[in-house]
Amino acid sequence: MKRWVMIFIVLFMVSGCQDNPDKDEPAENGNQTENNENNANTEQTGNKDNDKNYETVQFKEYPGKIAPEFSAKELTEPPSGNWLTNGGNLHNGRYSPLGKITTENVADLKLEWVTSLGSGMEFKYSGESTPIVYEGVMFNITGANEVSAIDAKTGELIWQYKPKLAEGLDTVCCGWTSRGVAVGDGKVFVGLLDARLVALDQKTGEVLWETQVDEWEKGYTITSAPLYYNGKVYTGVAGGEFGIRGYMAAYDAKLGRQIWRTYTLPAPGDRGSETWPKDSRGWLTGGAPVWQTPAVDPELGTIYFATGNTAPDLDGSNRKGNNLYSDSVMALDADTGEYKWHFQEIHHDIWDLDPANPVVLFDVKMDGKMRKGIAQAGKTGWVYILDRTTGEPLIGIEEKPVPQSEKQKTSPTQPFPIGDAFVPQTVTKEDVKKDLPKDFNGKIGSIFTPFWDKPVTVKPSPQGGANWPPSAYNPNTEMFYVLGNDNYFAYAHYGEEEQEKFEQGKEYIGSVWQPVKDSPSRGTVTALDIKTNKIVWQKNWDTIAYSGILTTKGNLIFTGHNDGRIIAYNATNGKKVWEFKTDAGANAPPITYEIDGKQYISIFSAGNTLAGTKHGDKIYTFSLEGEYSSLEDIPRDDINAPPEKNEENKEKHGDDEAKSENGGGTVSTGADIYKGNCLACHGAEGAGGHNGPNLQDSKMINDKKALIEQIKNGSGTMPPFKDTLTEEEINAVAEYLMSLSKGEE
């Protein structure tokens, strides 16, 4: 049954927020606050043509309670029965005091239910969502931005919301994804890739309001889960690779009106503007997005988050200075957005080593005194541990001299945290012999080694260190758990004739980066002592670690693996104590919750574009009383799915979604298919991607047979497309790639 409803839109105009960048007016400390006049002028219109905007499908009556306007106490308590925020509570610690599942009995954990969502299986989508659970109902979002309400006890679908994203949307940098939703005040809050913030009716999935946060045509998108707190919905924006001006903003949860917006790039005359060239317009195009869910300390009245890289990512030649507030942990007044403090992890970033991992708040006794801490795991491979009251390091961080490049305008020093790095930070001669091709003869370096016209291969890479997959803190072990990536990336600056200029809505990278051909990618699962920043134990994987971590009172951590496994480790010593193989890459963080005294573990296993993993659409939920030891044990009829899709349709759905309506072998058709399946890794027009080589320079670019073979079967971290694209589509992509050859005009 389809239910079409009228949409209630809240449109807003805020001076200096939505105008053309040329008209942006400097605001004190980059902060803009709504006044009464702004609120009075907010336009409200109904009767939007929702035939072009969204669809809701109701499968059964809503069985649970309606979420209240949660108090600060409710949102700060460690999650037990419910999982109320993306990070479990306002502190983002992903720790649960539920302890019925322990190291002693976790081997008995079995599959309780599986639900197929029927969405987000095309390769361009990534399943990175953390489910929310409130009073027996789970809320999850797919990479296609479709939201489902699910009976958390049985897995039965309650409703689905299916937005129609903006036609022509092509400014998504790093895979189409969403990392979750928020719940509060009877609403489910959703950030969409076309930069809309939407409030859904918790019982029906119908739209109550939506706000166009910014213009996707300029590169603004929303990939993070919003945060509900104190009657407000907080969200940042992604898009640093497109030269946006990053910010964090708060919206009225009842109507969607903007309350405040604080920019992460200071306008001329604002605090921090001295870290940009005086004649630079970098404050309008310099990036510093906020693409992870923030944390809040209600006692201090402070909201915390990390900011992204500068733009252009890899070219510092025209932005001399530290480029605040990029690559920083920031603290703002949660009510007003006013600046409190910042700590910059990378000065003048030219490596795309921005702090992508969500910040985690914790309280711990140090030197006989309880301290309010904040930890952020960086792409650098270090964890930065600060006092969240002042922003000063709780454990020492030293400014040390680093190699210099006059052309890149590098910073003379960089912060070096005291403690252990959780991934290697240099490429050694032994690494070259062990891991790299025999014909490799390039320059090698370490973290903070600059580059210019000649390629330099370094560690860590733009994948990390720690990337977006959330870390966790367990107050019982006093350990911080983090996933790390260890791979080889080469950087080189464009030649003068290829010098990249800013063009609105186009990628603004500034140089070339790519993984070293035929080199291994590895991952780490690491436990660090929060008081010393020293490694307690570490597990090494033969693939990148790209999911997230849950830790519990049962002395366990749970995480997902690229091969589809969800794995449990002993939180104290790292011993593997349980695993279960799903049917797709387990590339999202697990959660836990309790209903009627039974503890559940749940994960969205749907694959990931940048990890190159198999795609799917299922949520897997486990308990000690579960019935199934493997996916093969569960009868197909017992897998929950949208009623209109039978199992045969579900098996075909991934293929159907991935196939172009146009078909054929034309270059234009190939370009469309490329955008949907290849752009995130290889970049626009085959260059500037996040996990793939520059195709324009590839030796096979003019060899159609070799291209078709590569697309069909994949290699290294590239997955095969023979099962998701037709012969005609593969041929079309090959023809498009051949058109990119530098030998053609």
Where are these regions (language model features)?
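Electrostatic cytochrome c docking/interface patches
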Residues: 642-673
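Blade-level signature of beta-propeller repeat domains, shared across WD40, Kelch, NHL, RCC1
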Residues: 591-641
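C-terminal capping alpha-helices of c-type cytochrome domains
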Residues: 191, 711, 722-745
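Blade/loop signatures of beta-propeller domains
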Residues: 47-112, 264-271, 432-451, 515, ...
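Bacterial signal peptide processing site
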Residues: 17-20
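Gly/Gly-Pro-rich "capping" loops immediately C-terminal to redox-active cysteine motifs
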Residues: 671, 680-717, 721-724
